[in-house]
């Protein structure tokens, strides 16, 4: 038995490669079942996000070559392409990796809270697929428990430093009371979703989501009581927008200086806070030259992120120590589980011997034998049978000079005297 954690992430693979190794939600159940059917994986779960694709496995041997081959084949990569950017962690290292990931210690943004929810979703999907059993299930539960401890006992989750958090925190600096502010969000991807959530939690007066497709904008808007519009309707919304945050995949700017200038006139030059998170940029840089416009780029936000990260290094160290404790505790429990089957078999053997001797005693009593003698014979017989196999093995070990095994037997039976002598 071995635990394996393997995959690629933002540190080992480019976006182009990560896109090729990503699993869509629609693929997940079938992929998990195929993984367990075609490889030596007995239990499996898959975590697939924009920054990582990882497989968590309970496998019957300590290598994962067949799993890497399956992953490459599934996504139509060559094995060499995958090996060039993949990592494989085994047993204690695999446990540590999972706990670090769930705690946000392996994330692009240190301590980001979304990853724990994503890992819980991966576990839920694996359960739905029927590919999680008792061992991997215990590891996930221990991982969630450790991540929760990290969140509650350290400051790793305080003053979040994701780009979305940074954008909203800057907005709070510009507008002291967000309850009176209206926001226009351009795009409907993961980052804009996070921005929408943070603005909603801050009680922003009104949120408008603009996207290339109205369906996608509506799906996001429904989550936060927002209003959905098409990109073509942005000029009509600009004049009412105190906050504009954009993150799309457009190759050309969506907002130009002229459109913003016209909106400012309608606003009577009331300040407008704008954040362009997109690469390439959604908002023409010249917009920042306008009075009453506070325009920030993704690079500006990264400076905020980097500054906040410095203050969280102490929290990160404390989190690493908690992860270490979580790993040690889980590995100890895992080792204890290894004794369960042996203890169960030993108990069954003892109960069988007990039943044999008890049946013999009951027959003797039925035939009128002296109860005291029957009890004595029962005790002697049970003692002899229970000691027979261990006695034979200890004599054999002694003859072979296995003093260490005899010392272990003494510890096993909690004997105070009769220690083996060299």
Swiss-Prot record:
Its EC number is 1.2.1.70. Keywords: NADP, Oxidoreductase, Porphyrin biosynthesis. PROSITE patterns: GLUTR. GO terms for molecular function: glutamyl-tRNA reductase activity; NADP binding. Transmembrane segments: none annotated. InterPro entries: 4pyrrol_synth_GluRdtase, 4pyrrol_synth_GluRdtase_dimer, 4pyrrol_synth_GluRdtase_N, GluRdtase_CS, GluRdtase_dimer_dom_sf, GluRdtase_N_sf, NAD(P)-bd_dom_sf, Shikm_DH/Glu-tRNA_Rdtase. Pfam families: GlutR_dimer, GlutR_N, Shikimate_DH. Disulfide bonds: none annotated. The record marks 97 as: Important for activity. The active site is at residue 50. Catalyzes the NADPH-dependent reduction of glutamyl-tRNA(Glu) to glutamate 1-semialdehyde (GSA). During catalysis, the active site Cys acts as a nucleophile attacking the alpha-carbonyl group of tRNA-bound glutamate with the formation of a thioester intermediate between enzyme and glutamate, and the concomitant release of tRNA(Glu). The thioester intermediate is finally reduced by direct hydride transfer from NADPH, to form the product GSA. HAMAP family: Glu_tRNA_reductase. This is Glutamyl-tRNA reductase. It comes from Pseudomonas aeruginosa (strain ATCC 15692 / DSM 22644 / CIP 104116 / JCM 14847 / LMG 12228 / 1C / PRS 101 / PAO1). The lineage of its organism: Bacteria, Pseudomonadati, Pseudomonadota, Gammaproteobacteria, Pseudomonadales.
